[in-house]
Amino acid sequence: MASNLPVRSFSEVCCAEARAAIIQMENNPDETVCNRIWKIHRDLQSSDLTTTVQVMMVYRFISKRVPEGCFAILSGVNTGMYNPRELKRSYVQSLSSGTSCEFLRSLDKLAKNLLAVHVCSDVKMSLNKRQVIDFISGEEDPTLHTAEHLTSLALDDSPSAVVYSGWQQEAIKLHNTIRKIATMRPADCKAGKFYSDILSACDQTKELLDAFDQGKLAYDRDVVLIGWMDEIIKIFSKPDYLEAKGVSYQVLKNVSNKVALLRESIWWVTELDGREYLFFDESWYLHGMSAFSDGVPGYEDFIY
């Protein structure tokens, strides 16, 4: 398939409720992280079956492991009207004949979810990216199942395009806003070093992120963005900013408060075996954001 065709990520075609978890797994395919995400959704009573199944399928594809306790998600669900063995047999036949997409579309939601559980639980069955896309995309975008669109998706097993997790997206927006505002400092401003330090921190961060996304460096995107937030917080803790004035300074100050709040919402958690992973407390961040009545003045205007 042509290499210049776009590669769609799972998070682009899954249901909205599963998107955050799937983005996390796509961005950080570490076994410990993905396993934790799967178990959280498996045991989450408020998660509906379709959401849990989509998280399960992406976990199965990324980890190449049978999801632990996958049949537990069917607890309390009446599946007696279906024969899972027959469903699976028909699905395997449709794979051989190239009609799997049409077969999945012929199933109702419960039958498809039941089939997904049995497919994921089969240690002898491998899943490729196209199969997972076929399972999880039907609810969001039926056009993904047309032959022409499937061709344009380049559904292979190569790495997905860069996708940022929820907190990373927010950090990038804040970075772009601060960087843009810092270039608009007043001509007679006495706080030249303050603005220069901000621009330097943002430019260095952008250079690292660009190199990372192009595969030139092996930097961890999480570490780069956290380092940038720490640097911005440090710059605003120095006395240089006291000389800054005007609208641009007010916007910078408000955005820096958001940076500090976002940074406080992210921390490293250490497992019993000594392995570390990042935890983002979105509820803490959103609670703090409620203090901003209408958001940062001119915030959206400076995002590019």
Swiss-Prot record:
Pfam family, one: Mx_ML
Record keywords: Host-virus interaction, Inhibition of host innate immune response by virus, Inhibition of host IRF3 by virus, Inhibition of host IRF7 by virus, Inhibition of host RLR pathway by virus, Viral immunoevasion
Gene Ontology terms describing biological process: symbiont-mediated suppression of host cytoplasmic pattern recognition receptor signaling pathway via inhibition of IRF3 activity; symbiont-mediated suppression of host cytoplasmic pattern recognition receptor signaling pathway via inhibition of IRF7 activity
InterPro entries: Mx/ML_C
Superkingdom, taxonomy of origin: Viruses
Keyword Ubl conjugation: no
Summary of the function given for this chain in its UniProt record: Blocks host IRF3 and IRF7, thereby inhibiting IFN-beta expression and activation of host antiviral state.
Protein name stated in the entry: Protein ML
Organism encoding this protein: Thogoto virus (isolate SiAr 126) (Tho)
